[in-house]
Amino acid sequence: MTLNIEKRADGDSTTIRLIGRMQAEHLEELEKQIRESGPALILDLNEVTLVDVEIVRFLGACEARGATLLNCSPYIRDWIGKEQD
């Protein structure tokens, strides 16, 4: 399964809905979508089914820069915390 990306802008905020498996091969496209977004970024992870360590580190870095991780599953949240330790 591939990753589907749906993007919605609403004023100054942009929500990027991620659907499917997120792997390192998707980082370039994700970074491009984020660069083209407004200052308030929301990453909706509700339909993410699988991540790898590079994605976990990427999500942690996004959050550290002010992005909101919406609907982040507990296992991804825990993994982000472990990578930041």
Describe these PLM feature segments.
Residues 1-14:
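Short beta-strand/loop segment at the start of cytosolic alpha/beta domains
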Residues 18-85:
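Amphipathic alpha-helical interaction surfaces in cytosolic regulatory modules
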